[in-house]
Amino acid sequence: MAQAWAFLLPLLVLGSYVTSLFFPTYISNPLCGGDGGRSFHLCAQAPKDPDPPAVSTMYKTAFHFQPAKNWMNDPSGPMYFNGIYHEFYQYNLNGPIFGDIVWGHSVSTDLVNWIGLEPALVRDTPSDIDGCWTGSVTILPGGKPIIIYTGGDIDQNQAQNIAFPKNRSDPYLREWIKADNNPVLRPDEPGMNSIEFRDPTTGWIGPDGLWRMAVGGELNGYSAALLYKSEDFLNWTKVDHPLYSHNGSNMWECPDFFAVLPGNNAGLDLSAAIPQGAKHALKMSVDSVDKYMIGVYDLQRDAFVPDNVVDDRRLWLRIDYGTFYASKSFFDSNKNRRIIWGWSRETDSPSDDLAKGWAGLHTIPRTIWLAGDGKQLLQWPVEEIESLRTNEINHQGLELNKGDLFEIKEVDAFQADVEIDFELASIDDADRFDPSWLLDPEKHCGEAGASVPGGIGPFGLVILASDNMDEHTEVYFRVYKSEEKYMVLMCSDLRRSSLRPDLEKPAYGGFFEFDLEKERKISLRTLIDRSAVESFGGGGRVCITSRVYPAVLADVGRAHIYAFNNGSATVSVPQLSAWTMRKAQVNVEKGWSAI
């Protein structure tokens, strides 16, 4: 469960929206951050059934997953079952602010177009009356899906609960029944914190034939992926040691644990036999981002052992370097792949969200796999998203000298998919790399912006640009030379993305290693979907999700996309392809689907 206190600001002024409608009632409780250990904020009781104003559509995405209205956060329990993809998610039925969380539920056959159903889980038992928080789905032998999720009781104590589909012959699995013995797991062991015990993983079977599952928790004041065993998935016993723990933080949210094969983008099902040579990834949501480690699952010790132990978690690898949190992966048996997606929060203000009538979205589903060198995960948008492409344009053989700006015309700059390869004629001019930059790549992106010339770079894309460039977002690369390798910095700079002063407008960034002596091309793919921008650099080595709110979105046909180079070295573009993206059908029904 991604706790909203980590992101939201106090609701101080609600503006004209509230003035014209009503004054909401505010509540304060520990889950809203009033427990002394978290930042305090107010959770608003939003209008039950408002019609969002027309301006709400200005920033609303066309092909990202989000409900028709109201607040959403973490993906919870995605799965593929009997020909249908299911996306469960944290959802507030009552308004566009955090609170009253239930499990929203949508289904799809292609991961692009979604039908919205009634909530799968609502707050109606003592063990989840304060919220049906994040969890997972595991498919048991015989094709029996089972939900395990975190619930909060009236005192905000957290425990794990189970639910089963009422009718497995229903292709959409609309109704779920909670187990009579809920909660099945309580934080009653010595050293555990009862309000920091949440987000169970998908289960897997160990060599002894017993089910295992990890739960994010605080143990003796430090973070841990707590490990549990079960014969039947109903009765669980805590293992005397965690799957993995770290004493540098006190809570890991939304842990995810899965197997990967180096250099193979085929997915692996944890409940099946894991092939020789496989690695494991342990992901955790911490410090407002999703980080991960690559290692092995030691069957003898029943523990995760990272390949490299890095004490400073600022140096841990990230799933995404932007506005991306609480990600969840699942094994897609339909196409033998592992898919991951995460929550991208709004970076405007809570009063803006009330005015829009909605808040939050999920990133485009991504295939995720392990690079051939076994050092990092790679990600790429699922191929199904390409079904929305239309109006393709292509350019080959471009040369970008220092200061050049090439406009990519004839695509909808609000909804576009752009793929571009940059080729370096020479790498001799690369500036020297400072290893201290790895501690804070965002700071370096801010200090060395797209207008600051370097030896090689910056070069990349300018997107959502107004006519006079007073609003624009830059996604670009810089190339550096260290003693033994080349390092590429990828940035998504939002500082001039909007004229509005009341927004979060950082310069996101991440580094990746690249063997430029063998391969001189660096690829960039950017998907633009109004207020959501997702960029994939170096074949998915660095991914950055950004949220932007430019005024230019109000002027149809007035935004621009450019390729640029501000570095001293000339950059070639052997291939540039761009498409307008059609609108997907995403939870468009008014009310719940009646099918």
From Swiss-Prot:
GO terms for molecular function: fructan beta-(2,1)-fructosidase activity. It comes from the Eukaryota. Inhibited by sucrose. Coiled coil: none annotated. The active site is at residue 74. One of its GO terms (biological process) is carbohydrate metabolic process. Keywords: Disulfide bond, Glycoprotein, Glycosidase, Hydrolase, Signal. Its EC number is 3.2.1.153. Hydrolyzes inulin-type beta-(2,1)-fructans. May play a role as a beta-(2,1)-trimmer during graminan biosynthesis. PANTHER family: BETA-FRUCTOFURANOSIDASE, INSOLUBLE ISOENZYME CWINV1-RELATED. This is Fructan 1-exohydrolase. It comes from Aegilops speltoides (Goatgrass). The gene is 1-FEH.
